From Swiss-Prot:
The chain crosses the membrane at residues 28-48. Keywords: Host membrane, Membrane, Signal, Transmembrane, Transmembrane helix. The keyword Protein transport does not apply. It holds the Pfam family DUF5464. This is Protein 1.4. It comes from Escherichia phage T7. InterPro entries: DUF5464 (IPR035180). The keyword Disulfide bond does not apply. It is a single-pass membrane protein. Its main location: host cell. GO terms for cellular component: host cell membrane; membrane. It is found in: Host membrane.
Amino acid sequence: MFKKVGKFLAALAAILTLAYILAVYPQVALVVVGACYLAAVCACVWSIVNW
């Protein structure tokens, strides 16, 4: 129960932080989002390859 709440709060904090960065530093946020997207795509491809 507490682990789920902790994960939810961590995700919420990450989203709020990202939103704040997006509002204050748009260029930096775009780079960060692009890097995260690239990492997610790589992880998906890696999991498919190693299925």
